[in-house]
Amino acid sequence: MFPEDEAALSDAILDTAGPLQILGGGTRRVGRISEGRKLSTAQLKGIVLYEPGALTLVAKTGTPIAEIENVLAGENQMLAFEPMDHRVLLGTQGTPTLGGVMAANVSGPRRIQVGAARDFALGISFVVALANY
């Protein structure tokens, strides 16, 4: 299942009676892996709002970190927490995404000085098991 918006994601969850295997950018697997129906967040991507003067960016969970960094670089800005790309260390492929960074709190060497990834999140919306969003 590859839902393209929150409503389709909600429907996919409601239509599944058993366990779900949530798939993101595919850079690494964390936790107990479910053998359930596969549900990908890959199509839930894109920058919804960017206000450089307010240092505010809103993006969907499947948005690649590289896309966010490119947009920020255009305004001489960056992600202060420097999300680490684990692919080389883990020998994996895939695309690091905003959802993965926030879920795993992936932060680089500046974490000690400026804070972790989640410290920069002003808000997060998500679909719960009852398919509310």
Short names for language-model regions:
Residues E82, G91-Y133:
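FAD-binding subdomain of flavoenzyme oxidoreductases
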